[in-house]
Amino acid sequence: SLDRRQRQMCIRDRDCHYQLNGSFTGDSSITILKDFSCKYVILGHSERRSYYNETNLTVKKKSKICRENGIQPIICVGESFIRRKDGSYMNFILNQIEECIEPNLDEVIVAYEPIWAIGTGETPLNKEINEVKEKINLFLKNSKNVKSAKFLYGGSVDSNNFNEIIIGSDSDGALVGGASVKEEEITKIITNADFN
């Protein structure tokens, strides 16, 4: 039922500042997020990287302050259409992971959002999503000594493809963008989602 699914949800934010508190217009401070019992923060989204020139180092600083304050960062990674086509996408993604994520963590959540799929209505094939998931998980385990990793997919996720992507790609969840601000779409996703 929808009520049961609502109880499974929690508060998350779309970004934060890398200092604990202060006057950072347009950014949420960790102190405020804690006051609202925020459990997750999305960091390194492609729009933040593009519009605000956010770097991997900035994402790493934000991730560190989140972890120090009991908030789980969701680290976004993903490639452009050009990188996908020229075959350099995996090196690009793993470099983002290398530079954004600290070693020796108990748990990491990575959201794979191919930039070419965001808002375009196009999504990679499930086998392509799985390839990225497998390489990221292997890299986190072998190069970063991460104990547990969760993998989310984001990029043109909507009520028509949510279950197919989550089940078909063996993702642990989705980063829903444009569809999340459309009441009818997000209600359909929540109502029809196969959480088994």
Name each model feature, range by range.
Residues 62-67, 168, 180-196:
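C-terminal helical cap(s) of enzyme catalytic domains, especially alpha/beta-barrels
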Residues 8, 37-41, 72, 167-174, ...:
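Glycine-enriched alpha-helix->loop->beta-strand junction motifs that scaffold or abut catalytic
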